[in-house]
């Protein structure tokens, strides 16, 4: 019982967070030496840092054709948009679904569908609020093109935010990916854009809470029309 309770709160941590947690812990020790109340503030910040870099196990649906959310967060935009030019996917608009991550969300990014990475392109840029429309065009970003088994392509774009200053991408051209497989993360608040193939409708709604690697975002085999929703 106690172990189950602990596992609810204690999750694995992404290796990217090790140095940050160590720095916070050292600063906390110094703060305790200066003044105990400051030390307890440091403890709180250290716990938050660990929580930010958590990397929990996710149960990913494995049926062929399902596209899952690449990030934890909230669906902030659903609109037609041309994928990043640096991916070379052409000028035709695709349906773009944006998932905004705040500083309390898990920031590990996962592949929305299995396939082979055909392009990885980093572009420096601004650090506007990631929830804004123009963040897709103006902010620092790292874009991936993934070719599916049937030859179609999707794009996944990691976008830095107002606080984020570090995009981590752990794959390169030619890397095979499984649906829900980890491929990177963004530190301290950001956004993920997914560009769906032509004719594929999103099965999520604006404002919907997403769980990376688990929430079904779209289905390549479904004739269902785009979903609508209401807050209740």
From Swiss-Prot:
EC top class named in words: lyase
Compartments, record wording: Cell membrane
Q: What is its EC number?
A: 4.1.1.65
Q: What is its main location?
A: membrane
**Could you give a GO molecular-function term held by this entry?**
phosphatidylserine decarboxylase activity
What Gene Ontology cellular component terms go with this record? plasma membrane
Q: Does the keyword Cell membrane apply?
A: yes
According to the UniProt record, list the residues that bear Pyruvic acid (Ser).
190
Q: Which reaction does it catalyse?
A: a 1,2-diacyl-sn-glycero-3-phospho-L-serine + H(+) = a 1,2-diacyl-sn-glycero-3-phosphoethanolamine + CO2
List, in alphabetical order, the GO biological process terms annotated in this UniProt record: phosphatidylethanolamine biosynthetic process
Cofactor names from the entry are: pyruvate
Pathway per the UniProt entry:
Phospholipid metabolism; phosphatidylethanolamine biosynthesis; phosphatidylethanolamine from CDP-diacylglycerol: step 2/2
Q: How does it sit in the membrane?
A: Peripheral membrane protein
**Which residues does the Swiss-Prot or TrEMBL record annotate as the active site?**
190 (schiff-base intermediate with substrate)
Q: Can you state the subunit structure given in the record?
A: Heterodimer of a large membrane-associated beta subunit and a small pyruvoyl-containing alpha subunit.
Q: What functional role does this protein have?
A: Catalyzes the formation of phosphatidylethanolamine (PtdEtn) from phosphatidylserine (PtdSer).
> What is this protein identified as?
Phosphatidylserine decarboxylase proenzyme
Species this chain originates from: Cereibacter sphaeroides (strain ATCC 17029 / ATH 2.4.9) (Rhodobacter sphaeroides)
**Which classification does the entry list for the species?**
Bacteria, Pseudomonadati, Pseudomonadota, Alphaproteobacteria, Rhodobacterales
- Gene assigned in the entry: psd
